[in-house]
Amino acid sequence: MKTGVRIKQHDITDCGAACLASISAHYGLNLPIAKIRQMASTDRKGTNVLGLIEAAGKLGFEVKAVKSKQPDGTNNVEPLQKIPTPAIAHVIKNEKLLHYEVIYSVKKDRIQIMDPGTGELEWIKIEDFNKEWTGILLRRDSEPICLTNNHGIVKSICFSLSHILFS
């Protein structure tokens, strides 16, 4: 597994697809953003959460969307330290632009994100992340296994470990 794969989105609507491309590459499955855009039904407005879940499923990832809000409307960042990473966070940039970022690591007071807008991997303070985070998170339910043939070409796109163990 590669750690923190940097992927830069091609245009403003590609952030969700770029995040999924980054996570796929993290597990050794390199796919073009254009292919993931198709899988996620990305349109001129971008990709919605359902589209990302469906595309992730087609890639063999079992994911679910969760929302973390406290009664006062603020995000509860404590569960972030318990989520399996990488995960995709829905954020609002500059108080107006809906965007997705990949969370690669969470420490006590810092979070490592890959922002497809810049294509960079960076550590930021959790309180700064919390200011932009909508509370929506796409997290995986199990470790995927990617199979490749002896030429390094994907023979069978990622299968979830639970499919193998419980089929």
Q: Language-model segments: which ranges?
A:
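Aromatic- and glycine-rich peptidoglycan recognition patches
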Residues: 129-132, 137-138
